[in-house]
Amino acid sequence: MNFLAHLHLAHLAESSLSGNLLADFVRGNPEENFPPDVVAGIHMHRRIDVLTDNLPEVREAREWFRRETRRVAPITLDVMWDHFLSRHWSQLSPDFPLQEFTCYAREQVMTILPDSPPRFINLNNYLWSEQWLVRYRDMDFIQNVLNGMASRRPRLDALRDSWYDLDAHYDALETRFWQFYPRMMAQASRKAL
């Protein structure tokens, strides 16, 4: 899961959106640096990552990547799941339009920015102003996201080529998304994530 899915599942679970978004920017035990609700959100994010990576649908999808891109498949798939969520948002969350959800999420996250790591602050400078969560629905934007990540982290250069794996298996990936994401939504609503 990437930014949009973590925020969405956090909302469904009535968990801290701030903590769920911040989690990838925090190493180790967050308890000494953040309030309890944010810490709980960080822990939820980490549980979701472990759960998602071990889903049979996700393990199967990783195998569809070519040998030269399989190492970055988990990252690429996380971004792709956000694509499908953004694209099908009106079906999955009909009572909370994506644009409104994005504004709501931004308001929640802004409260912790003054005490956040610089890389997280930098992300927030772009995430909201450039409407990433809405733009995830466009595959051209997904390609830009993968290229941007590869540019910032040269050891992840294979992300550029992983675009072709997504393109080649688009329909099958979408099917897998529909198999697991509604289950995760139900788990979040039951506060079972």
Swiss-Prot record:
<keyword id="KW-0276">Fatty acid metabolism</keyword>
<dbReference type="GO" id="GO:0008770">
    <property type="term" value="F:[acyl-carrier-protein] phosphodiesterase activity"/>
</dbReference>
<keyword id="KW-0378">Hydrolase</keyword>
<keyword id="KW-0444">Lipid biosynthesis</keyword>
<dbReference type="InterPro" id="IPR023491">
    <property type="entry name" value="ACP_phosphodiesterase_gpbac"/>
</dbReference>
<dbReference type="InterPro" id="IPR007431">
    <property type="entry name" value="ACP_PD"/>
</dbReference>
<protein>
    <recommendedName>
        <fullName>Acyl carrier protein phosphodiesterase</fullName>
        <ecNumber>3.1.4.14</ecNumber>
    </recommendedName>
</protein>
<comment type="function">
    <text>Converts holo-ACP to apo-ACP by hydrolytic cleavage of the phosphopantetheine prosthetic group from ACP.</text>
</comment>
<keyword id="KW-0443">Lipid metabolism</keyword>
<dbReference type="GO" id="GO:0006633">
    <property type="term" value="P:fatty acid biosynthetic process"/>
</dbReference>
<keyword id="KW-0275">Fatty acid biosynthesis</keyword>
<comment type="similarity">
    <text>Belongs to the AcpH family.</text>
</comment>
<dbReference type="Pfam" id="PF04336">
    <property type="entry name" value="ACP_PD"/>
</dbReference>
